[in-house]
């Protein structure tokens, strides 16, 4: 509609919808950059985070975090950790 609340506006925009992703461990920052999609090994199963995701805090189990940006894929193995998502900023603390 014209009330500015239509979700279609942001998705049809030519601007790229990227999120900021930061993965940190006790050793320091493992990854800091942009991502269009991030997959996590959650306690109840794997889940994906896409732009405009609702705020979230979730525990992570052993597995692999996978992320994608401009067609390039990356991954980070983890033992345990947690993720916080807020305003297209994904903060991950892992061991």
Task: Give a label for each model feature.
Residues 1-18:
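Short, Lys/Arg-enriched N-terminal segments with co-localized hydrophobic residues
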Residues 18-95:
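Compact, glycine-rich, soluble single-domain proteins
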